[in-house]
Protein backbone atom coordinates (compact mmCIF):
# COMPACT_ATOMS: atom_id res chain seq x y z
CA UNK A 1 0.00 0.00 0.00
CA UNK A 2 2.92 2.38 0.54
CA UNK A 3 3.53 2.63 -3.24
CA UNK A 4 0.09 4.27 -3.54
CA UNK A 5 1.51 7.18 -1.56
CA UNK A 6 4.25 7.73 -4.16
CA UNK A 7 2.19 7.47 -7.34
CA UNK A 8 -1.14 8.53 -8.75
CA UNK A 9 -3.34 5.70 -10.02
CA UNK A 10 -5.67 6.14 -12.98
CA UNK A 11 -8.01 3.30 -13.91
CA UNK A 12 -9.85 3.25 -17.24
CA UNK A 13 -13.29 1.67 -17.46
CA UNK A 14 -15.26 1.11 -20.67
CA UNK A 15 -18.95 0.92 -21.52
CA UNK A 16 -20.51 2.96 -18.73
CA UNK A 17 -23.94 4.19 -19.75
CA UNK A 18 -27.15 5.31 -18.02
CA UNK A 19 -28.60 1.85 -17.44
CA UNK A 20 -29.01 0.45 -13.93
CA UNK A 21 -25.98 -1.66 -13.11
CA UNK A 22 -23.77 0.13 -15.66
CA UNK A 23 -22.71 3.21 -13.70
CA UNK A 24 -25.81 4.80 -12.21
CA UNK A 25 -25.85 6.58 -8.88
CA UNK A 26 -26.47 3.97 -6.19
CA UNK A 27 -25.02 1.06 -8.20
CA UNK A 28 -22.73 -1.17 -6.15
CA UNK A 29 -19.91 -0.65 -8.67
CA UNK A 30 -20.15 3.14 -8.28
CA UNK A 31 -19.73 2.70 -4.54
CA UNK A 32 -16.52 0.76 -5.16
CA UNK A 33 -15.14 3.57 -7.33
CA UNK A 34 -16.02 6.16 -4.71
CA UNK A 35 -14.34 4.07 -2.01
CA UNK A 36 -11.17 3.56 -4.10
CA UNK A 37 -10.98 7.31 -4.64
CA UNK A 38 -11.58 8.07 -0.98
CA UNK A 39 -9.13 5.50 0.40
CA UNK A 40 -6.35 5.56 -2.21
CA UNK A 41 -6.95 8.68 -4.31
CA UNK A 42 -7.61 6.60 -7.44
CA UNK A 43 -8.82 8.53 -10.45
CA UNK A 44 -10.91 7.07 -13.23
CA UNK A 45 -11.21 7.62 -16.94
CA UNK A 46 -14.69 6.49 -17.96
CA UNK A 47 -15.06 5.66 -21.65
CA UNK A 48 -18.73 6.20 -22.45
CA UNK A 49 -20.70 5.48 -25.65
CA UNK A 50 -22.92 8.48 -26.44
CA UNK A 51 -25.96 6.33 -27.40
CA UNK A 52 -25.23 2.80 -26.19
CA UNK A 53 -26.82 0.30 -28.61
CA UNK A 54 -29.20 3.05 -29.73
CA UNK A 55 -31.04 2.84 -26.39
CA UNK A 56 -29.34 5.36 -24.09
CA UNK A 57 -28.72 8.73 -25.79
CA UNK A 58 -26.79 10.91 -23.36
CA UNK A 59 -28.96 13.91 -24.26
CA UNK A 60 -31.88 12.14 -22.56
CA UNK A 61 -29.77 11.43 -19.47
CA UNK A 62 -28.10 14.76 -18.75
CA UNK A 63 -28.49 14.18 -15.00
CA UNK A 64 -26.42 11.00 -15.34
CA UNK A 65 -23.66 12.88 -17.19
CA UNK A 66 -23.80 15.64 -14.56
CA UNK A 67 -23.45 13.04 -11.78
CA UNK A 68 -20.13 11.91 -13.27
CA UNK A 69 -18.72 15.17 -14.58
CA UNK A 70 -19.13 16.81 -11.15
CA UNK A 71 -16.60 14.39 -9.65
CA UNK A 72 -13.11 15.90 -9.78
CA UNK A 73 -11.58 12.41 -9.79
CA UNK A 74 -13.29 11.34 -13.02
CA UNK A 75 -12.56 12.12 -16.66
CA UNK A 76 -15.32 11.37 -19.14
CA UNK A 77 -14.11 10.19 -22.54
CA UNK A 78 -15.84 9.09 -25.74
CA UNK A 79 -16.23 5.39 -26.53
CA UNK A 80 -18.01 5.49 -29.86
CA UNK A 81 -21.61 6.43 -30.45
CA UNK A 82 -23.64 3.20 -30.63
CA UNK A 83 -20.98 0.73 -29.44
CA UNK A 84 -22.22 -1.68 -32.07
CA UNK A 85 -21.96 -2.15 -35.82
CA UNK A 86 -24.76 -0.83 -38.01
CA UNK A 87 -23.45 -2.15 -41.34
CA UNK A 88 -22.68 -5.79 -40.57
CA UNK A 89 -19.18 -5.19 -39.18
CA UNK A 90 -17.49 -7.31 -36.52
CA UNK A 91 -19.43 -7.42 -33.24
CA UNK A 92 -19.27 -4.11 -31.43
CA UNK A 93 -16.22 -2.80 -33.32
CA UNK A 94 -18.13 0.25 -34.52
CA UNK A 95 -15.19 2.06 -36.15
CA UNK A 96 -13.82 -1.02 -37.94
CA UNK A 97 -16.66 -0.82 -40.48
CA UNK A 98 -16.57 2.94 -41.15
CA UNK A 99 -14.64 4.81 -43.82
CA UNK A 100 -13.39 8.35 -43.21
CA UNK A 101 -16.70 10.08 -44.03
CA UNK A 102 -18.73 7.54 -42.08
CA UNK A 103 -16.44 8.00 -39.07
CA UNK A 104 -16.69 11.80 -39.27
CA UNK A 105 -20.50 11.51 -39.35
CA UNK A 106 -20.55 9.06 -36.41
CA UNK A 107 -18.20 11.28 -34.38
CA UNK A 108 -20.41 14.28 -35.17
CA UNK A 109 -23.47 12.36 -33.93
CA UNK A 110 -21.57 11.46 -30.77
CA UNK A 111 -20.33 14.99 -30.15
CA UNK A 112 -23.87 16.28 -30.63
CA UNK A 113 -25.07 14.03 -27.79
CA UNK A 114 -22.21 15.15 -25.55
CA UNK A 115 -22.74 18.81 -26.44
CA UNK A 116 -26.37 18.63 -25.32
CA UNK A 117 -24.97 17.67 -21.91
CA UNK A 118 -22.63 20.68 -21.88
CA UNK A 119 -19.53 18.52 -22.16
CA UNK A 120 -17.10 17.63 -24.94
CA UNK A 121 -14.71 14.76 -24.25
CA UNK A 122 -11.05 15.14 -25.17
CA UNK A 123 -10.21 11.44 -25.25
CA UNK A 124 -11.48 8.51 -27.29
CA UNK A 125 -11.25 4.71 -27.24
CA UNK A 126 -12.71 2.58 -30.02
CA UNK A 127 -15.41 0.09 -29.01
CA UNK A 128 -13.86 -3.35 -29.43
CA UNK A 129 -10.46 -1.63 -29.86
CA UNK A 130 -10.62 -1.89 -33.66
CA UNK A 131 -10.64 0.71 -36.42
CA UNK A 132 -9.07 1.09 -39.85
CA UNK A 133 -6.69 3.77 -41.12
CA UNK A 134 -9.50 5.96 -42.51
CA UNK A 135 -11.66 5.90 -39.38
CA UNK A 136 -8.50 6.24 -37.27
CA UNK A 137 -7.56 9.42 -39.14
CA UNK A 138 -11.05 10.86 -38.49
CA UNK A 139 -10.78 9.99 -34.79
CA UNK A 140 -7.36 11.61 -34.54
CA UNK A 141 -8.66 14.83 -36.10
CA UNK A 142 -11.44 15.20 -33.54
CA UNK A 143 -9.85 14.19 -30.22
CA UNK A 144 -6.80 15.30 -28.22
CA UNK A 145 -5.78 11.71 -27.55
CA UNK A 146 -6.77 8.16 -28.41
CA UNK A 147 -6.44 5.22 -26.01
CA UNK A 148 -5.32 2.33 -28.20
CA UNK A 149 -4.62 -1.37 -27.79
CA UNK A 150 -0.88 -1.92 -27.53
CA UNK A 151 -0.89 -4.50 -30.34
CA UNK A 152 -4.09 -4.17 -32.38
CA UNK A 153 -3.63 -0.53 -33.43
CA UNK A 154 0.14 -0.33 -33.98
CA UNK A 155 -0.21 0.17 -37.74
CA UNK A 156 -2.78 2.99 -37.50
CA UNK A 157 -1.54 6.58 -37.77
CA UNK A 158 -4.02 8.58 -35.69
CA UNK A 159 -2.20 11.89 -36.09
CA UNK A 160 -2.72 12.71 -32.41
CA UNK A 161 -1.41 11.57 -29.03
CA UNK A 162 -1.95 7.88 -28.29
CA UNK A 163 -1.94 6.07 -24.96
CA UNK A 164 -1.41 2.32 -25.17
CA UNK A 165 -3.26 -0.19 -23.04
CA UNK A 166 -4.52 -3.76 -22.94
CA UNK A 167 -7.81 -5.56 -22.42
CA UNK A 168 -6.85 -6.22 -18.80
CA UNK A 169 -3.91 -5.81 -16.48
CA UNK A 170 -3.34 -9.59 -16.60
CA UNK A 171 -2.48 -9.18 -20.31
CA UNK A 172 0.13 -6.48 -19.68
CA UNK A 173 3.82 -7.36 -19.45
CA UNK A 174 4.47 -4.20 -17.48
CA UNK A 175 2.51 -1.42 -15.86
CA UNK A 176 2.93 1.89 -17.66
CA UNK A 177 4.00 4.85 -15.55
CA UNK A 178 3.58 8.28 -17.10
CA UNK A 179 4.15 11.54 -15.20
CA UNK A 180 4.18 9.65 -11.88
CA UNK A 181 0.83 8.03 -12.73
CA UNK A 182 0.17 4.31 -13.07
CA UNK A 183 -1.86 3.63 -16.21
CA UNK A 184 -4.06 0.52 -16.10
Regions found by a protein language model. Give the residues of each.
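Active-site beta->alpha N-cap acidic-glycine motif
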Residues: 1-71, 120
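Active-site-adjacent pocket scaffolds in enzyme catalytic domains
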Residues: 2-3, 10, 56-58, 63, ...
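Histidine-centered beta-alpha loop that forms part of the nucleotide-sugar donor binding/catalytic region
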Residues: 14, 49, 81, 150-152
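Amphipathic alpha-helical segments that form well-ordered structural scaffolds
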Residues: 32-36, 109, 113-116, 138
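Metal-dependent polysaccharide deacetylase catalytic core of the NodB/CE4 family, i.e.
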Residues: 43-133
Amino acid sequence: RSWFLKYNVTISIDDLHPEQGWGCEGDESVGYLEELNKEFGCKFNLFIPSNYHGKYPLSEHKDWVDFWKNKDWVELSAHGHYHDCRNGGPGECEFAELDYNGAIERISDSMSEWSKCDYLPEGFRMPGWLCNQESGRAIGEKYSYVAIHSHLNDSINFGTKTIKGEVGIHKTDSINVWNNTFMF
